[in-house]
Amino acid sequence: GMAAWLRTLGVTRTAVLDRAAPGQEGVWDTFARMPELRTPKQLNGLDMGLPALSVQRWYIARFGEAAWASIDRIPRLHWMDYLRWYRATLQLPVVNGVEVLNVRPATAADEAPAEDCIAVDTLQDGRPHTRLSRLVVLTTGMDGAGAWRVPAFIADALPADRCHHSSDAIDFTQLHGQRVGVLGHGAAAFDNAVAALRAGARSVDLCFRRARLPRVNPHRHIENAGLLTHYARLPDAIRWQVASHFRRVDQPPPRGSFQQACRWPNFKAHAACPWDEVRWTGHDIDVHTSQGRFQFDHVICATGHALDLAARPELQSLAPAIARWQDRFTPPADQTHPVLAAHPYLGEHYECLPRTPGIDSDWVTRVFAFNSLSYVSHGPHSTSISGHKHALPRLVRGITQRLFLDQAHTLVDDLQRYDTQELDLPEDFGIKPAASEPTPSLAALA
């Protein structure tokens, strides 16, 4: 969406670097396993206000008016098909099979054409290559601030083939006839439980720490134009309180995934059942909880991602140089939260800001974080599907503003040199002729 929007504004020298193979970008046809998006079908904004590019128009053209009217959420694989169509239709400049190794200020060794360049070190087809760019946008999704991670006390205790994170590429056919334990209560937990049940798992026990599943989805309350458009202008104290609230009050699993899991007689959900100890007996996975012991053949941890900028190779130069919330805001003593404090403190247009003003300020502010790094600064929905309609224009304004201001020093000289004629007249037109010379008529000049 960003690349398409930039093109409409005349920014055409762009490249979208993606590690995945063509058509496999993102999570939708890889480890996302829900039957449908949890975002209501009307809350998406990749169409740039052009109805012909909307998912609604695409869906109706492919499946018909009745099919669109019958759904309230878009099926996941249909959404991925729409994204493939969107990319092909707009001929977006995606370069696949590229792994970004580092984003850093360009040096003399990079032979940068200007001092304001960013160097992007990449690996493609086994060969290193450094690309130069005036600006860089990080669009690395939910794990762009760290890594999907299995709790260490589980990962360290089990053979690798007996334990997976819900974001892993799991061969569910291998779970046929097995006892499967799932840790977590969110969308990924129930989606993976359903996938295991469909694959013929003997039993699936889903365990979670909370005393009861959330019923209310607080995310729906902030999916409005005012918040999604102007969230970054809120005072720091309010943004901090909102982020803190969402750390305490989680959203429920999607209704469809929950209902599908509960239809299976060999599925059980266990509230207030955190895993206290996990052991490998040589044959079984022995899990100790406050509700007793469980024995599994395989476990899936739907435990989300850890904030860990050091886990992202592309952030190795950026992470030490950027401002964090702990550098710019001190919450009341009863609102402290070390994870939120470690998030980057971003500018209004998602630009990174220097930890120490005046040091590294130019190159750092040329990097925009349109991913989970923006969670505290721009809100929990900013870079999700429901936020695109409002967030993408703000991001694009920041990019074009920076490109324009970079060229401000050329404005006056360019203006003074501008000499494109709009009216084609003889050079001597308007010069008072001698008395003996007739005045040319306008008709003769036409």
Question: How should each PLM-predicted stretch be described?
Answer:
Residues 27-28, 40, 48, 67-70, ...:
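A short alpha-helix-loop-beta-strand transition element characteristic
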Residues 24-29, 58, 85, 309:
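Tryptophan-centered motif/residue detector
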Residues 5, 19, 35-46, 54, ...:
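Long, low-complexity, intrinsically disordered N-terminal extensions of eukaryotic proteins, enriched
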Residues 46-80:
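A conserved beta-strand/loop capping segment in the N-terminal third of enzymes
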Residues 29, 35, 53, 57, ...:
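Flexible, active-site-adjacent loop/turn segments at secondary-structure boundaries
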Residues 1-20, 68-199, 203-446:
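Flavin (primarily FAD) cofactor-binding/catalytic cores of flavoenzymes
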Residues 20-49, 213-230:
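Conserved N-terminal glycine-rich FAD pyrophosphate-binding loop of Rossmann-like flavoproteins
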